[in-house]
Amino acid sequence: MSSKRIVKNIFENTDNDKVAISSESNSKISFKDLKTFIEDISKQLSGTGLSNKDRAAIVLPNGPAMATSFLGISSYMSAAPLNPSYKSEEYEFYLKDLNPKIIIVEKNSNNPSIEVAKKLNIEICELKTHKDQPDGLFD
């Protein structure tokens, strides 16, 4: 069973208007908007030259962006969330072990995973959020 199908199963019997994800700032994402977002992320990834057999490492703090990025990315390819508190040595171990094609980080992050990814020639993708979007949605 493909990961796209597994992620889709999560939402099969949900009310589209109900809240899927909320944040401390009282920002809310409905199941309908989350489904659309996941489909959009999957389409964006497929248009980048990344294969659904590739892996992505995600280095984000717990919260809506981590949840939505994991769901969106794992609907297309393997996604491996990594603890943003890891030290360089830990990132080097996990990134060598995972061998991801891409690493997802917050825009303007100074997380040590970025330097390790550069050293290992892993593409770095920074999440771009917009103030007019609910927490967890990004480009």
Outline where the language-model segments fall:
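Adenylate-forming
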Residues: 10-13, 34, 38, 45, ...
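Conserved AMP-binding/adenylate-forming
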Residues: 42-86, 98
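Conserved ATP-dependent adenylate/AMP-binding module captured primarily in the ANL superfamily
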Residues: 51, 86-115, 134-137
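Conserved AMP-binding A3 loop
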Residues: 30-32, 139
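Short beta->alpha linker loops
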Residues: 33, 61-62, 86, 107-109, ...
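Internal alpha/beta domain cores that form substrate/cofactor-binding pockets in large enzymes
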Residues: 57, 79-82, 94-98, 111-130
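AMP-dependent adenylate-forming
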Residues: 7-30
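Flexible, low-complexity linker/hinge segments
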Residues: 1, 129-139
